[in-house]
Amino acid sequence: MNELRRTLQKRIKDKEALVGVVGLGYVGLPLVKAFLKKGFAVTGFDIDRRKVDMLNQGKSYIKHITAAELRPFLSTKRFAATTEFARLTDMDAVLICVPTPLDDHRNPDLSFVLTTTETIAGHLRKGQLVVLESTTYPGTTDEEMLPILERGGLKAGRDFFLAFSPERENPGDPVYTAENTPKVVGGLTKDCLALADTLYSQVVVKTVPVSSTRAAESTKLLENIFRSVNIALVNELKMIFDRMGIDVWEVIQAASSKPFGFMPFYPGPGLGGHCIPIDPFYLTWKAREVDYSTKFIELAGEINTAMPYYVINKTLEALAEKGKSFKGSKILVLGIAYKKDIDDQRESPSLKIISLLQKKGAKVEYNDPYVPESSGHREYPGMSLKSVPLTAKRLRQADAVIIATDHTSYDFGWIVKNAKLVVDTRNAVKAGSKNVIKA
């Protein structure tokens, strides 16, 4: 056995290994918490000074991770956040949890991963384990990261260790957390796999070792493409059934009674979050290298991307029946987070809906108990809004109220009672109300 592997493996099992997490967002911070709870000392790295300062003051900027969960670890000095990346040298394991978005042409943007890898390479030492958790296309770890990390003369699998283990974070999920969700792990070599598997097995309920980093990278893509294409299917069925006067939600509920061969997926105003709207296009891009066109995956993406336009059209039809157009109409959007009971706005369909309404001349406001303000979006640089109070008067004054996110705290019966027109994209309101349309 490689002596460096033996030494690090012992440090991990003895909970003496120092863990560094790069990227303290919706993936990185839950991972930090998971390692802290299992007794490891963790340093969080981020370029955002505001996040670092808040964490070091015992405050949290993610609603489902409370300050009370972090403060005990600060007092024992087992956790610290920093913008000083020179401290990476002190880490035994470095876990990368940075964004992997798409560029303006919907091609993979690996700039965050590559910049982080360059930074790690500048501080890499013998005996370290580097793991990428960010979702990406097959080959990123060995084609993109490996040459950068080996540039200084150290050899992966001999002098340092490299692995890929895809994050499976589901923000705000009260049941499945970083700790009780199985972890897929793929290593560049057998020693790389063994170390990464040892590390995560200290923290998660179960590890799932696979044969390579590419197999691990592909696993995450399969998971999210599976969801994307099935959501696209029910979104298309929603539009078809609507024309036939059939309630797609009733149909899905009835089909769910079949105990085998069926898994329910639900339509909505479009996909949101950092994974499902983005990840399929990573495989689409990579597939071109092997001369393959991912028609099925791309079609699903087109359907899901079109859903905000469907919501807009349904709203316009309902307003037209009342002799109104979008221009000058007051529209209240309920929920700007991409799903209920969280504060995550990434890729939220609400943002697209608001943008489309504004372009058509509507006076748009939003309410979201989890998101007090919305600004700084890459795709919508001019958007800067603050959540307005949800009152009976505001509901009555709105020409249309769009339920874009079905937060549990919303009293939908009260909303329907006070609103002139409700456009329900989440099946939040029972059928039968004359002022409610499904979209």
Please place each PLM-identified region on the residue numbering:
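Structural/interface elements that position substrates and couple domains in central-metabolism enzymes
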Residues: M1-A439
